[in-house]
């Protein structure tokens, strides 16, 4: 899980979602998991 000030899609399988007010990226590739904050 990467924590970044700006989250972006890193590939076509990445999905940007909101969980508990946080913007997150979920993907089939675990390296692409990101959270804003």
From Swiss-Prot:
PROSITE patterns (alphabetical): RIBOSOMAL_L36 (PS00828)
Keyword Ribonucleoprotein: yes
Domain of life of the native organism: Bacteria
Cellular-component GO terms for this entry: cytoplasm; ribonucleoprotein complex; ribosome
Molecular function in Gene Ontology: structural constituent of ribosome
Example of a GO biological process term: translation
UniProt keyword terms in alphabetical order: Ribonucleoprotein, Ribosomal protein
Assigned protein family: Belongs to the bacterial ribosomal protein bL36 family.
Protein name: Large ribosomal subunit protein bL36
Lineage: Bacteria, Bacillati, Cyanobacteriota, Cyanophyceae, Oscillatoriophycideae
